[in-house]
Amino acid sequence: MARYVFITGGVVSSLGKGIASAALGALLQARGYRVRLRKLDPYLNVDPGTMSPYQHGEVFVTDDGAETDLDLGHYERFTGRSANKRDNITTGRIYQNIIEKERRGDYLGATVQVIPHVTDEIKQFVLEGNEEFDFVLCEIGGTVGDIEAMPFLEAIRQLGNELPRGNAVYIHLTLMPWIPAAGELKTKPTQHSVKELRSIGIAPDILLVRADRPVPPEERRKLSLFCNVRESAVIQALDVAHIYDVPMAYHKEGLDSEVLAAFGIDPAPKPRMERWEEVSNRIHNPEGEVTIAIVGKYTGLKDAYKSLNEALTHGGIANRVRVKLDWIESEIFEKEDPAPWLEKVHGILVPGGFGERGSEGKILAAKFARERKVPYFGICFGMQMACIEAARSLAGIEKASSTEFGPTKEPVVGLMTEWLRGNMLEKRTAAGDLGGTMRLGAYEARLQPGSKIAEIYGSEEISERHRHRYEVNIGYREKLEACGLVFAGLSPDGVLPETIEYPDHPWFVGVQYHPELKSRPFEPHPLFASFIAAAVEQSRLV
């Protein structure tokens, strides 16, 4: 039977519960255990798919097409296990399910209430489908005291009583701030956070204390005394240079040992940390450095491109180089010459995005990369803008544009209305709900034999994750290929362009999907490994 670890947060948000959960999952995996991670989000949105990147950060897409919290990306990258739609739930989804049941009459006329109906729905989500796992780690979004989180905290309190004795452990992540005027770390915020948690009925077994400097032994003893946890269970979570240092740091502090001790597992299997040691060594001891310009629309919030950032790091790990990122707002190129911004970089990446804002700047970035022979990687929107650039500059289609920006006589990029998923035909309309108009999840593609991208993958058949409404119009293939832009990858039915490339360019690749979502530190995605390798070659020329 699976054992459950519930991770809550206090004092302030953004302390890193997602990283802590992922790191603990990786440590338990390193000891040979089978681990599943789940995220419970208290917001009322059904999913984050329609939320602004500035509000929520990246939307992480799973193989089965779920739009989820970016923490699921951390879970996948740290553990190597692919998440699915059953690993993320929101208050909005919970209430949607309950209202549907109530309308069907499933509650047989009962008054539908937070307790027991909402809490029962949450508990069902936590418990279902865990038969093949040794540990299930559940991260509760938000902080203790948030009104939105109350049903989730009540549900995990109930689970602590309903599960067999010794099958649930509670970890509380808090902040221990340094007060310069006093010259000391303060325990009071953590004490009050634990007091709030205990008033709900949850007594934490382990305190994970975030701090920017070592926590003195006397302060640990103080937290142990006032928060009623063992002194060994007061674990400092110090700031580290890189997130892939976290598993090693937490292991050194004894987090995984304390969790296993709380479950009464003794003796515990010894962890194998060689892979994490190698990743850390490659990150901190690079043999070179390359600079990649990311020409995007949401560069003001780096979390909007979290998986992209990590995938580029993985590419650096594969090539033993440090990847320096130069974030550039694409609208700048609509006012200024791109050359001064781009002539010193070793690669240009144009990521996904939505809407017309900044699109002309991305087109100019693609043009610069094509003309100057700088490695270019266009992802989703970045591929579409590269095709529009080719249509305008090479094929003489001056009015080439996307129907996403408004009516156009030359729709090089247009709204998809139907496509195949396996043997099923899926249809969407522009008037449909935003959450239901996109091509989401893993789809197969066929790569052209002998193409650069087939060489990179080492295969002519691939499966990648998608998140887009618009697609390059296959009707322009002949004109664009006549200008040298090859449609090297298509959907299995040959209708949807999936990849493009210039054979006479050192490295110019566009993909309609999001390869960054499948990259892992131990298994860098081949496209990112190849892109960074091309940037290394470019660095020798600049």
Curated annotation (Swiss-Prot):
CDD domains to which the protein is assigned, alphabetical: CTPS_N, GATase1_CTP_Synthase
Gene3D superfamilies, per database record: 3.40.50.880, P-loop containing nucleotide triphosphate hydrolases (3.40.50.300)
InterPro entries with a match to the protein in the record: Class_I_gatase-like, CTP_synthase, CTP_synthase_N, GATASE, GATase1_CTP_Synthase, P-loop_NTPase
Keywords for the protein's UniProt record, in alphabetical order: ATP-binding, Glutamine amidotransferase, Ligase, Magnesium, Metal-binding, Nucleotide-binding, Pyrimidine biosynthesis
GO function terms (MF aspect): ATP binding; CTP synthase activity; glutaminase activity; identical protein binding; metal ion binding
Regulation of protein activity: Allosterically activated by GTP, when glutamine is the substrate; GTP has no effect on the reaction when ammonia is the substrate. The allosteric effector GTP functions by stabilizing the protein conformation that binds the tetrahedral intermediate(s) formed during glutamine hydrolysis. Inhibited by the product CTP, via allosteric rather than competitive inhibition.
Residue sites binding ATP per the record: S14, L15, G16, K17, G18, I19, D71
Residues binding UTP: S13, K186, T187, K188, P189, T190, Q191, K222
Keyword Metal-binding carried by entry: yes
E.C. designation(s): 6.3.4.2
Other noteworthy facts: CTPSs have evolved a hybrid strategy for distinguishing between UTP and CTP. The overlapping regions of the product feedback inhibitory and substrate sites recognize a common feature in both compounds, the triphosphate moiety. To differentiate isosteric substrate and product pyrimidine rings, an additional pocket far from the expected kinase/ligase catalytic site, specifically recognizes the cytosine and ribose portions of the product inhibitor.
Name of the featured protein: CTP synthase
